[in-house]
Amino acid sequence: MKHILLYILATSTLLSCGSDTKPAEQSTAPAINFKTSSVPVPFAGNWISETYLSDIKEHQSPRKAQENIEECYIQLPDNTLRPSTMVINFHEGISDLVTVNNNGVFQLWEKQGDTLSTLKYTIKPLSRDTIKIDDKLFIKINSSPAGNEPRILEEILFKGAYITKKGEHIEFKSNGEVSGFGKYKYYKPLIDYFDAGLQIDQVGLGETADKMEYFGFKFKRNKLELYKLKCDLYDEVDNRCVEVSYGIKAYDLQKSSGE
């Protein structure tokens, strides 16, 4: 289900993610009332699992990268007491995590009603662009929001200028817009592949942001190849393709030097 992640992220005003899931640690709630002890969070922003980011840089395949992570993304608020969601595998999430400052230590707590119930994660800043959530590293990224859904692959994989074999200039922007690509004005790479019909990396191209035509894609370092989708197995009951592969190559794009 391509829209599971969007549904999860929409349940909270903020988001989250990391590497390997760690069992919840039971602890006594902070003595200070969490409803009144609001302080600035010095490392607010969008944070992505270092494991996921490294895999994307090495293999350039979101589908492959999704196989190696659990906690993967979180958006931390500007101030404590505001909710966040820890995104798990880009498929589900732990919502309503409350950021608190417990005697100088920033933590994420689960709550029941208005009561902090369970210490879920401890956050330790390491540098301006790196934090540790429990024992997992997260890297700060500048992902443009799309409602409550972050544009992650747009920022870390697609963004940049490209040239076609005909010398046409195309630009994929981090906000999900594309220019110079004929009728296509928007693009949306899929980040969640835990469903039928998602056996290959896919990206949507559309004249509008809410109606996309999906293509299979392959990155070969600075080369982006887009393919028509080939349906190998169609489900007559659900009226959808449940197994796909790469079909005819539709576009061959070369990323400009320096991107």
Residue locations for each model-derived region?
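Positively charged n-region of N-terminal signal peptides that target proteins for export
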Residues: M1-I4
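Hydrophobic helical h-region of N-terminal Sec-dependent signal peptides
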Residues: L6-T11
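C-terminal motif of bacterial Sec signal peptides marking the signal peptidase cleavage site
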Residues: L15-S16
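Short, conserved catalytic or interaction motifs in soluble domains
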Residues: S19
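Beta-sheet ligand-binding and adhesion/scaffold domains
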Residues: P23-S37, L53-S54, V105-I156, Q199-E259
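Tryptophan-anchored aromatic micro-motifs
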Residues: A29-E70, F138, E149-H169
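N-terminal glycine/threonine-rich, aromatic-flanked beta-hairpin/loop signature
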Residues: E58-G104, K166-M212
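A charged, solvent-exposed segment within the mature domains of Sec-exported extracytoplasmic proteins
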Residues: S127-I191
